[in-house]
Amino acid sequence: MSYKLTYFPIRGLAEPIRLLLVDQGIKFTDEHIPKDDFVSIKSQFQFGQLPCFYDGDQQIVQSGAILRHLARKFNLNGENNAETSYVDMFYEGIRDLHSKYTRMIYEAYETQKDPFIKNILPQELAKLEKLLATRDNGKNFILGDKISFADYVLFEELDVQQILDPHCLEKFPLLKAFHQRLGDKPKIKEYCAKRNASKMPVNGNGKQ
């Protein structure tokens, strides 16, 4: 089976997918399409959107749908309905933070960056810290001893927020340790080192 991930040459919505594939040892083609070139091929994609993941001949768009597809396929979605729902809930909580971050980045960076760092970011991180603590006291993965697709989403979110504010995790020891723990996984560590050396932008407008 061949896999391909198509996205812009940024981290954006595709980065948790890349991290999952890399850490799980799943070989894939990482196709980067310059934004200016996307206009002419936009109609090729469902909803006219990227990222797009190809599982053989199947085309899947919407980052959450891609992540859940991979989670079902590679057992990264919990062992039962209760665990699957818990992972989904955690994922949606991370997305709440990311939606607020994205709105600030693309719509009001100059005026809202400082209020976001001071008010919104710590409030959202506190929610995630509290939820992380409910399994194994937050000392392992979101589900406890089993990694899930949401762990890769959380890792990337924490990584991005530390670019915005390097001190944002100081009051959240469980999240800080989680980020360090996943970042030390050999395949993730190697991938992130290469990515950071290439200076791949986080967002499409260059702001981060």
UniProtKB/Swiss-Prot annotation:
Gene Ontology cellular component list: cytosol
EC number(s) stated in the UniProt entry for this protein: 2.5.1.18
Pfam families the UniProt entry points to: GST_C_3 (PF14497), GST_N (PF02798)
PROSITE patterns: GST_CTER (PS50405), GST_NTER (PS50404)
Domain GST N-terminal: 1-78
Annotated ranges, domain GST C-terminal: 80-200
Coiled coil: none
InterPro entries per record: Glutathione-S-Trfase_C-like, Glutathione-S-Trfase_C_sf, Glutathione_S-Trfase, Glutathione_S-Trfase_N, GST_C, GST_pi, GST_superfamily, Thioredoxin-like_sf
Keywords linked to the UniProt accession: Transferase
A biological-process GO annotation: glutathione metabolic process
Function: Conjugation of reduced glutathione to a wide number of exogenous and endogenous hydrophobic electrophiles.
Quaternary organization: Homodimer.
Annotated family: Belongs to the GST superfamily. Pi family.
PANTHER family per record: GLUTATHIONE S-TRANSFERASE (PTHR11571:SF141)
Name of the protein: Glutathione S-transferase
